[in-house]
A protein has these predicted regions:
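Partner-binding and oligomerization surfaces adjacent to conserved cores of proteins
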Residues: 1-298
Length: 298
């Protein structure tokens, strides 16, 4: 079956997922990493990005004048935040934007019920990840935009497998950056450095969160968006903010269990979910519907 991953959400979202299921697939909204999170979250991964950049620069023997790590250091040390504002704006305008759906390795977790499961009135959708493609280190750059990827979030660090892949991608782009300068000279060198730095952050930032969130044990389903592709980006309003998203489909066969939160009337909710599965010609015998074991009443 593979490892299990859990998505805490509301009853409203569950109804929408099941009602709109097509071709035995559930359609999730993958939100832009930059519109759903604190836009300065990428700074938490400063050391990781710096380490990758400096190792690539050492391997490629990059001169001090062309080093992108120098720009990253200047932005990090800028007390006025002017550099950070320029970088944030460039990230929003970047051609390659990461969109994510959040999961957790924790099943039936009280903190996650409170944070993401409508304070105990929602559901926890338990999926097997075996049909979700992981990162493929071979030929990753062309493939990264053609499929979805699942990986562990790091809290102050990242896993070695992701680190190795990100290292390869950054080195590939760094070579293109140096080749462009070799062919065209150092005109617009700042813009070229900023573009490569943005790419490094776009690759690394989705898997980095502040250590205070380590209790979530998050895994993220990631999809990159290219502006020139045929992917459609849409928008919704949440908490007085406008969030951009793109659609990601997960096979219904991945859904193994629906845990009903500790607060609702379990029998009533369970019967309704079973009826809905039948109405959508989905086999409820393949999906367990169970009650949360968390002793919590809001």
């Amino acid at each position: 079956m593979g490892d299990l991953i859990c998505h805490y959400t509301t009853l409203e979202v569950l109804l929408s997922l099941l009602r709109n299921a097509e071709d035995k697939k559930l359609t999730f909204w993958a939100s832009s990493i930059y519109s759903m999170n604190d836009p300065t979250e990428f700074m938490y991964g400063y050391d990781i990005c710096m380490d990758i950049l400096q190792k690539v620069e050492k391997r490629l023997k990059v001169s001090d004048k062309l080093k992108v790590s120098k720009l990253w250091m200047d932005i990090h040390d800028d007390s006025s935040n002017d550099w950070k504002e320029i970088l944030i704006q460039s990230l929003y305008e970047n051609n390659e934007c990461p969109f994510v759906v959040s999961f957790s390795k924790l099943k039936d977790s009280l903190p996650l019920w409170k944070m993401y499961g409508n304070n105990g009135y929602g559901v926890c959708l338990v999926f097997s990840e075996y049909l979700v493609k992981p990162f493929n280190p071979n030929g990753i750059e062309p493939q990264i935009y053609n499929s979805i990827h699942l990986y562990d979030v790091g809290y102050g660090t990242i896993h070695q497998s992701e680190y190795d892949i990100f290292n390869k991608i950054v080195e590939s782009r760094y070579k293109k950056y140096l080749s462009t300068i070799c062919q065209n000279g150092c005109n617009n060198i700042f813009e070229k450095k900023l573009s490569l730095l943005c790419l490094t952050l776009v690759i690394c930032s989705p898997c980095i969160k502040h250590p205070s969130y380590a209790y979530e044990q998050e895994k993220r389903l990631l999809k990159y968006y290219l502006k020139e592709s045929n992917q459609k980006v849409q928008f919704y309003e949440k908490n007085n903010n406008i969030i951009s998203y793109t659609e990601v489909q997960i096979p219904i066969d991945n859904l193994k269990e629906i845990i009903v939160g500790p607060c609702p009337d379990f029998q009533s909710i369970s019967r309704s979910i079973t009826q809905l599965l039948h109405s959508q010609e989905l086999n409820p015998q393949d999906i367990k519907i169970v009650q949360s074991e968390v002793p919590y009443r809001n």
